[in-house]
A protein has these predicted regions:
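Active-site microenvironment of metallo-dependent hydrolases
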Residues: 1-29, 33-39, 44, 90, ...
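Divalent-metal coordination cores built from histidine and acidic residues
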Residues: 6-7, 84-188, 495-499
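Short, ordered loop/turn segments at secondary-structure junctions
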Residues: 43-44, 99-102, 130-131, 167, ...
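Metal-associated gating/positioning segment near the N- to mid-region
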Residues: 44-49, 53-117, 470
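Active-site neighborhood of phospho(di)ester-bond hydrolases with catalytic His/Asp-centered motifs
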Residues: 64-70, 97-100, 128, 163-165, ...
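Short acidic, glycine/serine/threonine-rich loops at helix termini
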Residues: 106-110, 136-142, 173-178, 202-206, ...
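Histidine/acidic residue-rich metal-binding segments in metalloenzymes
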Residues: 144-163, 169-235, 242-262, 273-287, ...
């Protein structure tokens, strides 16, 4: 085709090609496609148009390589088909997902099914082997994953490396982490980092162990230090954190930025529904003054090269024809999207709805904890008052220690909404025998009611927080009856719920419907006094042992920095 000796299978005419190699944008030209690849670019050769050649007139619009989200979490909340309807339809042709949530929820059985769903998804879904399931087995319980099962996932052809491994496990020489790294290095696969808080000698040790990336830069200085050590810098902008404004200026004017990427780390629901996964990130990069072709490279060529996805990530001869035609380089709205040269979407909609991937009935029976009556949430103490240790929120993801004096009634320590002190519980979801720990939480603002969810990071155990034992029981039993999800209760009523029956963490519903139910839960909590804009993010992270300082697990209250259990009653 390039030599003008054969017709193209498809032809895109008058397209401005965004070149991610030299960061130039061409004048309107033609792009010939054949056998799922880009065959030629330039003035149209007479032979390119054959009797069966499909022709698309771009009319001066911009042709980009398909976008690649190099770090996200597609193993909870929604299925991959519904995600594709919003991501692929806007030009996001590939995603690299962590699997830690599914591993914690359902172990190897869930991972095998999720990989089967990924193989059948409309867009390309690559995965990362979950490294530490759970991260700290001495503190917490999850479904678990043996080293043999880890190696099975790592060897999968669509698995590109080891998922984010917390830096203390690496520099402290944790045996599981070292074995995982060695297995991946033997296969030539990447080692994804989670270097939050690591600097200087610790960060160097983390890199020296073989870690290849970090998505935890929260400042320009963080990004510069990681780049200087040879780490790929993945800049987050999504549901959990938004760091482009702080970090992008450090990357914008570098002579060479091949180690830079923009990632969602899980796309914000509203952004995903309105504009797509990486599209809002490209728009923000443009607003921050990044040259459009450079920003596109951060979301295409750079991830492809980093993960060794040869012949992906560019509009160039021989490259896979995963392409998006966008109307402008400010909002990056996609008119057409191709996957391997086949048109898949037009004006933000897939041409064919994705075929539903149906999980077996066992998927909805993974929450195995026993019934949780009100008395399960009673914490015994003598006398009429008790002084307790309290986990206080210090932002969405960090906690600190506080103390409170609480009333004891009939031998049970009560919550005190007047002091903004709730009772909380962390229940092992994997045991038919009741295994749980109780504690107290501050920073929720609830005046009445309770919330419950098992969508907590890494372990996916059941977290409950509330003003009374009866309301905690109602919220927890609602989640248990749904097989997983979110619930808000007050008095004797369930005010809102979001069922997540697949592995206890995924809904089969369309993403907008999942978002609607999550918003119902947020509004219900707001009506009960909770002022948080994202209360369930706080719920997800409140028991997360990967960040400081005080965390409640199913085994007890943990001081993460001191690396020991501490007493609730003082």
């Amino acid at each position: 085709v390039a030599l003008g000796r054969a017709p193209a299978e498809a032809l895109i005419t008058h397209a401005r090609v965004v070149n991610v190699f030299n960061h130039q944008i061409s004048a309107p030209t033609s792009v010939a496609l054949a056998q799922g690849r880009v065959a030629a670019i330039g003035p149209e050769a007479p032979a390119w148009r054959g009797p069966d050649t499909q022709v698309w007139e771009a009319g001066g619009a911009y042709l980009l390589p398909g976008l690649i989200d190099a770090h996200t979490h597609l193993d909870s909340m929604f299925q991959l088909g519904p995600y594709s309807e919003l991501a692929l339809a806007r030009g996001n042709t590939s995603a690299v997902t962590e699997l830690a949530m599914m591993a914690g929820a359902w172990g190897i059985n869930g991972l095998r099914l999720l990989l089967a769903e990924a193989a059948a998804a409309p867009l390309r879904v690559f995965s990362l082997a979950p490294p530490l399931v759970p991260p700290f087995p001495e503190w917490e319980t999850s479904a678990g994953l043996s080293f043999e099962n880890f190696k099975e996932i790592l060897a999968h052809p669509d698995c590109l490396g080891v998922g984010e491994t917390y830096w203390p496990a690496i520099i402290d020489g944790e045996e599981r982490a070292a074995m995982n790294y060695a297995a991946a290095q033997a296969l030539g696969k990447t080692l994804e980092g989670h270097g939050a808080g690591a600097r200087g000698a610790r960060l160097m040790a983390y890199a020296a162990a073989g870690t290849t990336s970090c998505h935890e830069s929260v400042s320009a200085a963080d990004a510069a230090e990681r780049l200087a050590l040879g780490l790929a810098v993945m800049v987050r902008e999504g549901f959990v954190r938004r760091e482009m404004a702080a970090v992008v200026p450090a990357l914008r004017d570098l002579p060479e930025s091949g180690q830079a990427m923009l990632v969602t780390d899980l796309a914000d629901f509203e952004d995903l529904i309105a504009a797509g996964a990486l599209n809002p990130l490209l728009a923000k990069a443009a607003a921050l003054g990044v040259a459009p072709a450079r920003a596109v490279a951060w979301c295409s060529l750079n991830p492809a090269r980093y993960f060794g996805l040869r012949y992906m990530g560019a509009v160039a001869p021989g490259y896979v024809a995963d392409l998006a035609l966008v109307e402008d380089l400010q909002e990056f709205r996609a008119r057409w999207v191709w996957l391997e040269g086949r048109l898949k979407a037009q004006q933000g909609r897939l041409l064919q709805p994705p075929q539903a991937f149906v999980y077996p009935p066992s998927a909805s029976a993974t929450l195995r904890c026993p019934p949780l009556p009100p008395e399960a949430f009673c914490l015994a103490a003598p006398g009429g008052r008790a002084r307790v240790r309290v986990v206080e929120a210090a932002g969405d993801t960090i906690t600190k220690e506080a103390q409170a004096e609480l009333k004891v009634a009939q031998g049970n320590v009560l919550a005190d909404p007047g002091q903004d002190v709730l009772k909380m519980a962390h229940v092992n979801r994997h045991s038919a025998e009741l295994k749980m720990a109780l504690g107290f939480a501050k920073g929720w603002g609830l005046r009445q009611g309770a919330l419950a969810t098992n969508l907590i990071w890494d372990t996916t155990n059941l977290f409950v927080a509330g003003c009374s034992e009866a309301e905690m029981s109602l919220a927890a039993e609602t989640v248990r009856a749904m097989g997983g999800g979110l619930a808000v209760a007050a008095g004797q009523r369930v005010l809102a719920r979001l069922p997540l029956p697949i592995g206890g963490i995924i809904s089969p519903e369309p993403v907008p419907e999942v978002h609607r139910m999550a918003e119902d839960c947020r509004r219900a909590l707001a009506g009960l006094g909770c002022p948080l804009p994202r209360p369930f993010l706080r719920a997800q992270t409140f028991c997360f042992t990967g960040l400081p300082f005080l965390r409640l697990t199913d085994k007890g209250l943990v001081d993460v920095r001191a690396r020991k259990f501490v007493e609730v009653l003082l």
